[in-house]
Amino acid sequence: MIIHSLLDTDLYKFTMMQAVLHQHPAAQVDYRFKCRTPGVDLAQFVDEISREIDALCRLRLREDEVDYLRSLRFIKPDFADFLALFHLDRKYLSLTASATHPGEIELTIRGPWLHTILFEVPLLAIINEVWFRNTSEPDFEEGRSRLREKVASLRSMPAGCKIADYGTRRRYSRQWHGELLPLLRDGLGEQFVGTSNVYFAKQYGLTPLGTMAHEYLQAFQALGPRLRDSQVAALESWAREYRGDLGIALSDVVGLDAFLRDFDLYFCKLFDGMRHDSGDPFEWGERVIAHLEAHRVDPRTKVLVFSDGLNIDKVMRLYQHFHTRCRLAFGVGTSLTNDLGPTPLQIVIKMVRCNGQPVAKLSDSPGKSMCEDIGYLRYLRDVFGLPPMAEG
Protein backbone atom coordinates (compact mmCIF):
# COMPACT_ATOMS: atom_id res chain seq x y z
CA MET A 1 0.00 0.00 0.00
CA ILE A 2 1.48 3.33 -1.10
CA ILE A 3 -0.73 5.78 0.83
CA HIS A 4 -0.98 4.93 4.53
CA SER A 5 -2.76 8.05 5.78
CA LEU A 6 -5.16 10.70 4.49
CA LEU A 7 -2.69 13.22 5.92
CA ASP A 8 -0.22 12.14 3.20
CA THR A 9 -1.21 15.10 1.04
CA ASP A 10 -0.55 18.82 0.71
CA LEU A 11 -1.81 21.16 3.42
CA TYR A 12 -3.59 23.41 0.94
CA LYS A 13 -6.02 20.60 0.17
CA PHE A 14 -7.29 20.82 3.74
CA THR A 15 -7.34 24.63 3.82
CA MET A 16 -9.33 24.75 0.58
CA MET A 17 -11.59 21.92 1.75
CA GLN A 18 -12.48 23.85 4.89
CA ALA A 19 -13.52 26.87 2.83
CA VAL A 20 -15.58 24.60 0.57
CA LEU A 21 -17.34 23.05 3.58
CA HIS A 22 -18.28 26.46 4.94
CA GLN A 23 -19.12 28.30 1.72
CA HIS A 24 -19.79 25.90 -1.18
CA PRO A 25 -20.67 22.47 0.23
CA ALA A 26 -23.01 21.65 -2.67
CA ALA A 27 -20.61 22.51 -5.52
CA GLN A 28 -20.12 19.71 -8.08
CA VAL A 29 -16.81 19.36 -9.92
CA ASP A 30 -14.97 17.35 -12.57
CA TYR A 31 -11.23 16.67 -12.55
CA ARG A 32 -9.18 15.05 -15.30
CA PHE A 33 -5.72 13.43 -15.31
CA LYS A 34 -3.08 14.26 -17.91
CA CYS A 35 0.44 12.93 -18.47
CA ARG A 36 2.52 15.56 -20.26
CA THR A 37 5.53 13.24 -20.64
CA PRO A 38 5.45 11.60 -24.11
CA GLY A 39 5.85 7.87 -24.59
CA VAL A 40 4.78 6.82 -21.09
CA ASP A 41 2.72 3.61 -21.05
CA LEU A 42 0.69 3.86 -17.86
CA ALA A 43 -2.11 1.66 -19.21
CA GLN A 44 -0.12 -1.51 -18.49
CA PHE A 45 -0.33 -0.68 -14.77
CA VAL A 46 -4.01 0.27 -14.61
CA ASP A 47 -4.95 -2.73 -12.42
CA GLU A 48 -2.13 -2.04 -9.98
CA ILE A 49 -3.08 1.63 -9.77
CA SER A 50 -6.71 0.62 -9.24
CA ARG A 51 -5.82 -1.62 -6.29
CA GLU A 52 -3.91 1.24 -4.68
CA ILE A 53 -6.93 3.50 -5.15
CA ASP A 54 -9.14 0.90 -3.47
CA ALA A 55 -6.76 0.92 -0.49
CA LEU A 56 -6.78 4.73 -0.42
CA CYS A 57 -10.57 4.74 -0.24
CA ARG A 58 -10.51 2.49 2.83
CA LEU A 59 -8.50 5.00 4.85
CA ARG A 60 -9.91 7.19 7.58
CA LEU A 61 -8.13 9.68 9.80
CA ARG A 62 -7.03 8.27 13.15
CA GLU A 63 -7.90 10.16 16.33
CA ASP A 64 -4.32 11.40 16.76
CA GLU A 65 -4.34 12.66 13.16
CA VAL A 66 -7.56 14.61 13.69
CA ASP A 67 -6.10 15.99 16.92
CA TYR A 68 -3.04 17.13 14.99
CA LEU A 69 -5.24 19.00 12.52
CA ARG A 70 -7.17 20.54 15.42
CA SER A 71 -3.87 21.87 16.75
CA LEU A 72 -3.34 24.00 13.64
CA ARG A 73 -4.51 27.53 14.39
CA PHE A 74 -6.54 27.89 11.18
CA ILE A 75 -8.47 24.59 11.36
CA LYS A 76 -11.92 25.19 12.86
CA PRO A 77 -13.61 22.69 15.21
CA ASP A 78 -16.51 21.84 12.90
CA PHE A 79 -14.12 21.03 10.06
CA ALA A 80 -12.05 18.75 12.29
CA ASP A 81 -15.27 16.99 13.35
CA PHE A 82 -16.21 16.55 9.68
CA LEU A 83 -12.79 15.09 8.86
CA ALA A 84 -13.10 12.59 11.71
CA LEU A 85 -15.97 11.01 9.74
CA PHE A 86 -14.52 11.50 6.24
CA HIS A 87 -13.30 8.95 3.73
CA LEU A 88 -12.73 9.08 -0.02
CA ASP A 89 -15.45 7.29 -2.02
CA ARG A 90 -14.43 5.22 -5.03
CA LYS A 91 -17.77 5.87 -6.74
CA TYR A 92 -16.61 9.37 -7.68
CA LEU A 93 -13.61 8.08 -9.63
CA SER A 94 -13.28 6.35 -13.00
CA LEU A 95 -10.03 4.73 -14.19
CA THR A 96 -9.61 2.84 -17.48
CA ALA A 97 -7.00 2.27 -20.16
CA SER A 98 -7.62 4.69 -23.02
CA ALA A 99 -9.50 3.16 -25.95
CA THR A 100 -8.21 5.79 -28.38
CA HIS A 101 -4.65 6.55 -27.23
CA PRO A 102 -2.64 3.35 -26.63
CA GLY A 103 -0.64 3.41 -23.41
CA GLU A 104 -2.58 6.28 -21.89
CA ILE A 105 -5.06 6.09 -19.03
CA GLU A 106 -8.39 7.84 -18.64
CA LEU A 107 -8.72 9.02 -15.05
CA THR A 108 -11.64 11.26 -14.14
CA ILE A 109 -13.09 12.39 -10.83
CA ARG A 110 -16.67 13.65 -10.72
CA GLY A 111 -18.75 14.49 -7.67
CA PRO A 112 -19.20 16.97 -4.82
CA TRP A 113 -16.16 19.23 -4.50
CA LEU A 114 -16.19 18.67 -0.75
CA HIS A 115 -15.91 14.90 -1.18
CA THR A 116 -13.45 14.81 -4.09
CA ILE A 117 -10.93 17.56 -3.30
CA LEU A 118 -8.61 15.19 -1.41
CA PHE A 119 -8.18 12.77 -4.33
CA GLU A 120 -5.64 14.68 -6.43
CA VAL A 121 -2.37 14.55 -4.48
CA PRO A 122 -2.46 10.90 -3.31
CA LEU A 123 -3.57 9.78 -6.79
CA LEU A 124 -0.57 11.50 -8.38
CA ALA A 125 1.74 10.01 -5.74
CA ILE A 126 0.27 6.56 -6.43
CA ILE A 127 0.69 6.83 -10.20
CA ASN A 128 4.27 8.03 -9.79
CA GLU A 129 5.26 5.29 -7.39
CA VAL A 130 3.60 2.51 -9.41
CA TRP A 131 5.39 3.72 -12.52
CA PHE A 132 8.83 3.97 -10.96
CA ARG A 133 8.75 0.72 -9.00
CA ASN A 134 7.93 -1.12 -12.23
CA THR A 135 10.25 0.69 -14.63
CA SER A 136 13.42 1.58 -12.72
CA GLU A 137 15.81 0.38 -10.06
CA PRO A 138 16.15 3.03 -7.37
CA ASP A 139 19.69 4.26 -6.69
CA PHE A 140 19.14 5.72 -3.25
CA GLU A 141 22.85 6.29 -2.72
CA GLU A 142 22.88 8.47 -5.83
CA GLY A 143 19.86 10.31 -4.46
CA ARG A 144 21.57 10.84 -1.11
CA SER A 145 24.70 12.11 -2.86
CA ARG A 146 22.70 14.61 -4.91
CA LEU A 147 20.84 15.69 -1.79
CA ARG A 148 24.10 16.31 0.08
CA GLU A 149 25.29 18.52 -2.80
CA LYS A 150 22.08 20.55 -2.64
CA VAL A 151 22.38 20.96 1.12
CA ALA A 152 26.00 22.09 0.74
CA SER A 153 25.04 24.62 -1.94
CA LEU A 154 22.30 26.10 0.23
CA ARG A 155 24.56 26.17 3.29
CA SER A 156 26.97 28.35 1.28
CA MET A 157 24.23 30.98 0.97
CA PRO A 158 23.20 33.53 3.61
CA ALA A 159 20.94 32.15 6.35
CA GLY A 160 18.00 34.04 4.85
CA CYS A 161 17.99 31.75 1.80
CA LYS A 162 15.46 29.15 2.93
CA ILE A 163 13.49 26.40 1.20
CA ALA A 164 10.45 24.21 1.84
CA ASP A 165 9.48 20.81 0.45
CA TYR A 166 6.59 20.95 -2.03
CA GLY A 167 7.26 17.56 -3.63
CA THR A 168 4.53 15.12 -2.57
CA ARG A 169 2.68 14.81 -5.88
CA ARG A 170 5.73 13.97 -8.01
CA ARG A 171 7.91 12.10 -5.53
CA TYR A 172 9.78 8.95 -6.49
CA SER A 173 8.28 7.04 -3.59
CA ARG A 174 6.80 7.47 -0.15
CA GLN A 175 9.86 5.77 1.37
CA TRP A 176 12.29 8.22 -0.28
CA HIS A 177 10.17 11.20 0.70
CA GLY A 178 10.20 10.02 4.30
CA GLU A 179 13.98 9.57 4.25
CA LEU A 180 14.96 12.89 2.71
CA LEU A 181 12.93 15.20 4.95
CA PRO A 182 14.90 14.55 8.16
CA LEU A 183 18.10 14.83 6.11
CA LEU A 184 17.00 18.29 4.98
CA ARG A 185 15.87 19.25 8.47
CA ASP A 186 19.13 18.19 10.08
CA GLY A 187 21.38 19.36 7.25
CA LEU A 188 19.87 22.78 6.71
CA GLY A 189 18.62 23.73 10.15
CA GLU A 190 16.70 27.01 9.97
CA GLN A 191 17.23 27.15 6.20
CA PHE A 192 14.62 24.38 5.90
CA VAL A 193 11.31 25.91 6.92
CA GLY A 194 8.88 23.01 6.48
CA THR A 195 6.90 20.83 4.11
CA SER A 196 3.58 20.93 2.32
CA ASN A 197 3.03 17.29 3.36
CA VAL A 198 0.85 17.13 6.47
CA TYR A 199 1.71 13.52 7.35
CA PHE A 200 5.45 14.10 7.39
CA ALA A 201 5.07 17.46 9.11
CA LYS A 202 3.33 15.61 11.93
CA GLN A 203 5.85 12.76 11.94
CA TYR A 204 9.00 14.88 11.95
CA GLY A 205 7.86 17.97 13.84
CA LEU A 206 8.03 20.21 10.77
CA THR A 207 5.86 23.20 9.93
CA PRO A 208 3.08 22.29 7.45
CA LEU A 209 2.90 24.89 4.66
CA GLY A 210 0.33 25.90 2.06
CA THR A 211 -2.64 28.15 1.32
CA MET A 212 -4.56 27.76 -1.96
CA ALA A 213 -4.20 26.01 -5.33
CA HIS A 214 -5.39 26.90 -8.82
CA GLU A 215 -8.59 24.90 -8.45
CA TYR A 216 -9.90 27.29 -5.80
CA LEU A 217 -9.77 30.30 -8.10
CA GLN A 218 -10.84 28.25 -11.12
CA ALA A 219 -14.01 27.08 -9.38
CA PHE A 220 -15.13 30.66 -8.92
CA GLN A 221 -15.37 31.00 -12.69
CA ALA A 222 -18.58 29.02 -12.15
CA LEU A 223 -19.37 30.00 -8.54
CA GLY A 224 -18.77 33.73 -8.71
CA PRO A 225 -21.32 36.40 -9.57
CA ARG A 226 -19.91 36.92 -13.07
CA LEU A 227 -16.85 35.63 -14.88
CA ARG A 228 -14.95 38.92 -14.95
CA ASP A 229 -15.21 39.15 -11.15
CA SER A 230 -14.30 35.51 -10.45
CA GLN A 231 -10.78 36.19 -9.17
CA VAL A 232 -11.97 38.95 -6.87
CA ALA A 233 -14.78 36.70 -5.61
CA ALA A 234 -12.32 33.89 -4.86
CA LEU A 235 -9.90 36.15 -2.99
CA GLU A 236 -12.71 37.75 -0.99
CA SER A 237 -14.08 34.30 -0.16
CA TRP A 238 -10.63 33.30 1.11
CA ALA A 239 -10.43 36.44 3.23
CA ARG A 240 -13.85 35.70 4.75
CA GLU A 241 -12.70 32.20 5.69
CA TYR A 242 -9.29 33.02 7.11
CA ARG A 243 -9.57 36.67 8.19
CA GLY A 244 -6.02 37.55 7.19
CA ASP A 245 -4.41 34.18 7.95
CA LEU A 246 -2.93 32.01 5.17
CA GLY A 247 -2.49 35.16 3.12
CA ILE A 248 -0.59 34.06 0.01
CA ALA A 249 -2.51 34.67 -3.23
CA LEU A 250 -1.89 32.57 -6.35
CA SER A 251 -1.26 34.85 -9.30
CA ASP A 252 -1.44 32.86 -12.55
CA VAL A 253 -4.91 31.35 -12.90
CA VAL A 254 -5.81 33.78 -15.69
CA GLY A 255 -2.32 35.18 -16.20
CA LEU A 256 -0.40 37.85 -14.33
CA ASP A 257 -1.81 40.82 -16.28
CA ALA A 258 -5.38 39.99 -15.27
CA PHE A 259 -4.32 39.14 -11.72
CA LEU A 260 -2.63 42.48 -11.15
CA ARG A 261 -5.66 44.34 -12.49
CA ASP A 262 -7.77 42.60 -9.84
CA PHE A 263 -5.20 42.76 -7.02
CA ASP A 264 -6.04 46.29 -5.92
CA LEU A 265 -4.91 48.33 -2.90
CA TYR A 266 -7.26 46.40 -0.60
CA PHE A 267 -5.76 43.04 -1.57
CA CYS A 268 -2.21 44.44 -1.56
CA LYS A 269 -2.69 45.42 2.07
CA LEU A 270 -4.76 42.40 3.12
CA PHE A 271 -2.66 39.55 1.72
CA ASP A 272 0.81 38.68 3.00
CA GLY A 273 2.14 38.04 -0.47
CA MET A 274 1.78 36.26 -3.80
CA ARG A 275 2.91 32.93 -5.27
CA HIS A 276 4.60 32.42 -8.63
CA ASP A 277 3.80 29.16 -10.43
CA SER A 278 4.36 29.83 -14.15
CA GLY A 279 6.18 32.18 -16.49
CA ASP A 280 9.55 33.86 -16.03
CA PRO A 281 10.11 34.19 -12.26
CA PHE A 282 12.43 37.18 -12.51
CA GLU A 283 10.03 39.15 -14.70
CA TRP A 284 7.16 38.12 -12.40
CA GLY A 285 8.99 39.33 -9.30
CA GLU A 286 9.85 42.67 -10.87
CA ARG A 287 6.26 43.24 -11.92
CA VAL A 288 4.85 42.28 -8.53
CA ILE A 289 7.26 44.59 -6.72
CA ALA A 290 6.41 47.44 -9.09
CA HIS A 291 2.70 46.77 -8.55
CA LEU A 292 3.07 46.94 -4.76
CA GLU A 293 5.09 50.15 -5.00
CA ALA A 294 2.48 51.70 -7.31
CA HIS A 295 -0.07 51.06 -4.54
CA ARG A 296 2.23 52.61 -1.91
CA VAL A 297 2.80 49.24 -0.23
CA ASP A 298 6.38 48.52 0.85
CA PRO A 299 7.45 45.26 -0.88
CA ARG A 300 9.80 44.55 2.03
CA THR A 301 6.70 43.82 4.13
CA LYS A 302 5.39 41.24 1.64
CA VAL A 303 6.39 37.68 0.73
CA LEU A 304 7.08 36.53 -2.82
CA VAL A 305 6.70 32.74 -2.95
CA PHE A 306 8.36 30.90 -5.84
CA SER A 307 7.24 27.33 -6.56
CA ASP A 308 7.48 26.68 -10.30
CA GLY A 309 9.95 23.96 -11.26
CA LEU A 310 12.61 25.17 -8.86
CA ASN A 311 16.01 23.62 -8.36
CA ILE A 312 18.64 24.80 -5.90
CA ASP A 313 20.54 26.81 -8.51
CA LYS A 314 17.40 28.74 -9.44
CA VAL A 315 16.58 29.30 -5.76
CA MET A 316 20.03 30.80 -5.23
CA ARG A 317 19.76 33.07 -8.28
CA LEU A 318 16.30 34.31 -7.29
CA TYR A 319 17.45 34.93 -3.73
CA GLN A 320 20.45 36.96 -4.89
CA HIS A 321 18.25 39.00 -7.22
CA PHE A 322 15.40 39.84 -4.84
CA HIS A 323 16.46 39.37 -1.21
CA THR A 324 17.09 43.05 -0.43
CA ARG A 325 13.74 44.15 -1.88
CA CYS A 326 11.12 41.80 -0.41
CA ARG A 327 10.64 38.76 1.78
CA LEU A 328 11.15 35.45 -0.01
CA ALA A 329 9.96 31.86 0.20
CA PHE A 330 10.88 28.94 -2.05
CA GLY A 331 8.89 25.73 -2.48
CA VAL A 332 11.01 23.04 -4.14
CA GLY A 333 9.25 19.95 -5.43
CA THR A 334 10.45 17.38 -7.95
CA SER A 335 14.09 18.46 -7.65
CA LEU A 336 14.05 17.31 -4.03
CA THR A 337 11.72 14.31 -4.02
CA ASN A 338 12.41 12.74 -7.43
CA ASP A 339 16.10 13.18 -8.26
CA LEU A 340 17.49 9.65 -8.14
CA GLY A 341 18.35 9.32 -11.83
CA PRO A 342 15.17 8.26 -13.70
CA THR A 343 13.34 11.04 -15.54
CA PRO A 344 10.41 12.35 -13.46
CA LEU A 345 6.92 12.18 -14.92
CA GLN A 346 5.07 15.38 -15.77
CA ILE A 347 1.59 14.43 -14.54
CA VAL A 348 -1.29 16.58 -13.35
CA ILE A 349 -4.90 16.32 -12.25
CA LYS A 350 -6.82 19.51 -12.96
CA MET A 351 -10.35 20.72 -12.35
CA VAL A 352 -12.08 21.07 -15.73
CA ARG A 353 -15.72 21.73 -14.71
CA CYS A 354 -17.62 23.17 -11.78
CA ASN A 355 -21.40 22.92 -11.49
CA GLY A 356 -21.51 21.69 -15.08
CA GLN A 357 -19.65 24.71 -16.49
CA PRO A 358 -16.13 24.60 -17.94
CA VAL A 359 -13.36 26.20 -15.89
CA ALA A 360 -9.77 26.79 -16.94
CA LYS A 361 -6.34 28.03 -16.00
CA LEU A 362 -4.68 30.46 -18.43
CA SER A 363 -1.11 29.81 -17.36
CA ASP A 364 1.80 32.20 -17.89
CA SER A 365 3.73 29.17 -19.25
CA PRO A 366 2.82 27.62 -22.64
CA GLY A 367 1.53 24.07 -22.27
CA LYS A 368 0.39 24.34 -18.65
CA SER A 369 -3.17 25.41 -19.46
CA MET A 370 -5.79 22.65 -19.39
CA CYS A 371 -9.42 22.87 -20.49
CA GLU A 372 -11.82 20.61 -22.39
CA ASP A 373 -13.70 23.47 -24.08
CA ILE A 374 -11.72 25.55 -26.59
CA GLY A 375 -14.65 27.93 -27.03
CA TYR A 376 -14.63 28.64 -23.31
CA LEU A 377 -10.88 29.29 -23.38
CA ARG A 378 -11.39 31.90 -26.10
CA TYR A 379 -14.22 33.48 -24.13
CA LEU A 380 -12.19 33.51 -20.92
CA ARG A 381 -9.28 35.26 -22.64
CA ASP A 382 -11.64 37.82 -24.11
CA VAL A 383 -13.36 38.54 -20.79
CA PHE A 384 -10.02 39.13 -19.05
CA GLY A 385 -8.63 41.21 -21.91
CA LEU A 386 -5.92 38.75 -22.93
CA PRO A 387 -4.61 38.32 -26.49
CA PRO A 388 -6.57 35.87 -28.66
CA MET A 389 -5.42 32.24 -28.81
CA ALA A 390 -3.01 31.32 -31.57
CA GLU A 391 -4.88 29.30 -34.16
CA GLY A 392 -3.61 25.96 -35.46
Swiss-Prot record:
GO terms for cellular component: cytosol. GO terms for biological process: NAD biosynthetic process via the salvage pathway. The modification Phosphohistidine is found at residue 214. Its EC number is 6.3.4.21. It catalyses: nicotinate + 5-phospho-alpha-D-ribose 1-diphosphate + ATP + H2O = nicotinate beta-D-ribonucleotide + ADP + phosphate + diphosphate. Transiently phosphorylated on a His residue during the reaction cycle. Phosphorylation strongly increases the affinity for substrates and increases the rate of nicotinate D-ribonucleotide production. Dephosphorylation regenerates the low-affinity form of the enzyme, leading to product release. Pathway: Cofactor biosynthesis; NAD(+) biosynthesis; nicotinate D-ribonucleotide from nicotinate: step 1/1. GO terms for molecular function: nicotinate phosphoribosyltransferase activity. The keyword Phosphoprotein applies. Catalyzes the synthesis of beta-nicotinate D-ribonucleotide from nicotinate and 5-phospho-D-ribose 1-phosphate at the expense of ATP. HAMAP family: NAPRTase. This is Nicotinate phosphoribosyltransferase. The gene is pncB.
